Curated annotation (Swiss-Prot):
It is an enzyme of class 2 (transferase). The lineage of its organism: Bacteria, Bacillati, Mycoplasmatota, Mycoplasmoidales, Metamycoplasmataceae. It comes from Mycoplasmopsis pulmonis (strain UAB CTIP) (Mycoplasma pulmonis). This is S-adenosylmethionine synthase. It is found in: Cytoplasm. GO terms for biological process: one-carbon metabolic process; S-adenosylmethionine biosynthetic process. L-methionine binds at E56, Q92, D231, K262.
């Protein structure tokens, strides 16, 4: 019988793209700490033994960008002999600043774009099942790496989880794949056994799902050369890992390195916040919200809702509720989600959504009662 399969992946902190995301967001946090009104758009490239920091920063303070980069790299097991770091950062374009820096309710979007928010009742965090398991696998692996619980485990790693939805009410794990960097002298059979017993099995047990899944650990054999030395990394190259694992649309804009005035980030967070509260209020079992903005414009150009046939209310009814009950101007989003005071670095790995381990404002369920009263 043909199976109904869906797959999502996640990556660890030492993945080259994620190293770049972490450097970008650590710089963002440092800049906002000294000047909460700073503007920041940091892009990092890591290739072989060279790391380049580019982008724009406008701030009243000073941050040593190279030192911030080393903090991340050293935490991942590298030394100052491993890389050369070059910084080439400019100020924000004055034409963009003219739209963003207005000090009243007329703050406009810093760019055009489309953003999506999504929620599903599949998991307690209102995230799709496949990406939730994939994140938990690399999260546990990183914890064991830091604690030195698995011999030779290093920080570059990937997970991939395939869910069988042939029975929609009882999804099953079909396949789990993990590739994890390790020291050269590691015995691969022992390493694979440790990964299965100490990482994969405990995570699967947490979900109370089937144990008869296919499992592949380092299927290509040895994986001793990793991180930027093995592959080039760039900020913003893991946007599906950062969001919903492919279970929802993505507008294309990355998050890391961008301050709260960038609607690529702030509006995507707001769309998630609204979708999660609506699903938690049982308005729908699954919900996707699209927002679109134009540069310099205060309100979104469009709001679109897709409940995938899981709601007794029409998508237009839900759209009208959003339009009439949530202020979606950039200024209102910043204030509602307290984005000036949020620490962004912790979101730069293991996903920006469904993070029960973090106290993120866009994950709060503080609109549920209000929504339930409206949708009686």
């Amino acid at each position: 019988m043909q199976k109904n399969l869906f797959t999502s992946e996640s990556v660890g902190r030492g993945h080259p793209d994620k190293i770049c995301d972490q450097i970008s967001d650590s710089i963002l946090d440092a800049v906002l700490k000294i000047d909460p009104n700073s503007r920041c758009a940091i892009e990092v490239m890591a290739s072989n033994r060279l790391i380049i920091i580019g982008g724009e920063i406008t701030t009243q303070g000073y941050v040593d960008l190279v030192s911030k980069s080393w903090e991340i790299l050293i935490s991942l097991g590298y030394t100052e002999n491993d890389f050369t770091i070059i910084s080439n950062v400019n100020e924000q374009s004055k034409e963009i600043a003219n739209q963003v820096d207005r000090q009243d309710d007329n703050i406009g979007a810093g760019d055009q774009g489309i953003m999506f928010g999504f929620a599903s009742d599949e998991t307690k965090s209102f995230m799709p099942l496949a990406i939730s398991i994939a994140h938990d696998l690399v999260k546990r692996a990183e914890k064991l790496r830091v604690e030195n619980k698995i011999n030779g485990l290093k920080s570059d790693m990937k997970s991939q989880v395939t869910i069988d939805y042939s029975d929609q009410k009882n999804p099953k794990i079909d396949t789990i794949l993990m590739s994890l960097q390790h020291d050269k002298d590691v015995l691969l059979d022992n390493f694979r056994n440790d990964v299965k017993k100490l990482i994969i099995e405990p995570v699967v047990n947490d979900y109370n799902l089937n144990s008869n899944y296919k499992c592949f650990i380092n299927p290509n054999g040895s994986f001793s050369i990793g991180g930027p030395i093995g592959d080039t990394g760039l900020t913003g190259r893991k946007i599906i890992v950062d969001t919903y694992g492919g279970a929802a649309h993505h507008g294309g804009g990355a998050f890391s390195g961008k301050d709260y005035t960038k609607v690529d980030r702030s509006a995507a967070y707001m769309a998630r916040y609204i979708a999660k509260n609506l699903v938690a209020a049982k308005v729908a079992k699954k919900l996707e919200i699209q927002l679109s903005y134009g540069i310099g414009m205060i309100e979104p150009i469009s709001i679109n809702v897709n409940s995938f046939g899981t709601s007794k209310f029409s998508d237009l009814e839900i759209t009208d509720f959003i339009r009439n009950n949530f202020s979606l101007s950039p200024k209102s989003i910043i204030e509602k989600l307290n984005l000036k005071n949020t620490k962004y670095f912790p979101t730069s790995f293991f996903g920006h959504f469904g993070r029960d381990d973090l106290d993120l404002p866009w994950e709060k369920l503080d609109q549920v009662d209000k929504i339930k009263k409206f949708f009686k």
